[in-house]
Amino acid sequence: MKSYKVNLELFDKAVHREYRIIQRFFDMGEAEEFKTRFKDIRDKIQSDTATKDELLEVAEVIKRNMN
């Protein structure tokens, strides 16, 4: 099985930016859910237990926030 490494610095920046967008334009509750979800995913990435779907979700967030 192939293991993929996520750049945690990019991940943190993208999650923070996405969180701020959700917080500003949508609902604070949704922003907190997003933050909690990605905190759990970050923990899984660090322990190499993240699923393929979670890694794809991370890739989408990073892709949306690359500038």
Swiss-Prot record:
Q: Which domain of life is it from?
A: Viruses
Record's protein name: Uncharacterized 8.1 kDa protein in rIIA-Gp60 intergenic region
* Organism, scientific name: Enterobacteria phage T4
